Amino acid sequence: MASERQYSPVDRLLLQADAALRTLLPFSGASSRPSPAIVQAETDLNPEESRHIAGLMRINHTGEVCAQALYQGQALTAKLPEVRSAMEHAADEEIDHLAWCEQRIRELGSHPSVLNPLFYGLSFGVGAVAGLVSDRVSLGFVAATEDQVCKHLDEHLEQIPEHDAKSRAILEQMRIDEEQHANSALAAGGVRFPAPVKFGMTLLSKVMTKSTYRI
């Protein structure tokens, strides 16, 4: 069996810079899977519906920016090669979500949040620190983060009208993927975070959702 390619520190920094650019630059993230919205018919939305749904999709897009940064930060400092590989694979799947959300936001006549670079930097730092503590903590942070994302997706699916089949199809597939990421992280040995830690993460996520809904 071929051994895993060994990257130098400079190589890894260049890979991280490439990942950041692909995450933050418009239309730079190419999905490996077609958007679930492609097979859904477009329906007429009134201006208020379009504005609200675009705001929700902007939140989800920024959430994927944060997840991408979190995974990249953890991959940079993960101690075990298999954990690093798992983080990089999960980050690749998040690129799909980024591309799907951005495409839908544009279709609704809006744009991604201008705060994305800020949230990327913060999330990357958190991921790198978690990876330095231990791989089990790093994996646990993934599981807890994905749980938060799933809650946001459930809330948004309740708000998006049934006739917006395109947006709903995207969020439903994202929900499946995120739950799988959380379960995989726990199965790989991630620690289950206590309720107080999860509560703190919920408060921080509210800052993101409130700010990116409009800008």
UniProtKB/Swiss-Prot annotation:
State how the cofactor is bound: Binds 2 iron ions per subunit.
Question: What Gene Ontology molecular function terms does this protein carry?
Answer: 3-demethoxyubiquinol 3-hydroxylase activity; metal ion binding
Look up the record and report any one GO term of the cellular component aspect: plasma membrane
This enzyme catalyses: a 5-methoxy-2-methyl-3-(all-trans-polyprenyl)benzene-1,4-diol + AH2 + O2 = a 3-demethylubiquinol + A + H2O
Identify its membrane topology class.
Peripheral membrane protein
In terms of Gene3D superfamilies, this protein maps to: 1.20.1260.10
Q: Quote the pathway field.
A: Cofactor biosynthesis; ubiquinone biosynthesis
Q: Give the location in the cell.
A: Cell membrane
UniProt-listed Enzyme Commission number(s): 1.14.99.60
Q: Which key words tag this protein in UniProt?
A: Cell membrane, Iron, Membrane, Metal-binding, Monooxygenase, Oxidoreductase, Ubiquinone biosynthesis
Q: Where does Fe cation 1 bind?
A: E64, E94, H97, E178
- Obligatory cofactor(s): Fe cation
Q: Which residues bind Fe cation 2?
A: E94, E146, E178, H181
Q: Which InterPro entries match?
A: COQ7_proteobact, Ferritin-like, Ferritin-like_SF, Ubq_synth_Coq7
Specify the enzyme's EC class, one word.
oxidoreductase
Q: What is its main location?
A: membrane
Q: Which GO terms describe its biological process?
A: ubiquinone biosynthetic process
What family is this? Belongs to the COQ7 family.
Protein task: Catalyzes the hydroxylation of 2-nonaprenyl-3-methyl-6-methoxy-1,4-benzoquinol during ubiquinone biosynthesis.
Name it: 3-demethoxyubiquinol 3-hydroxylase
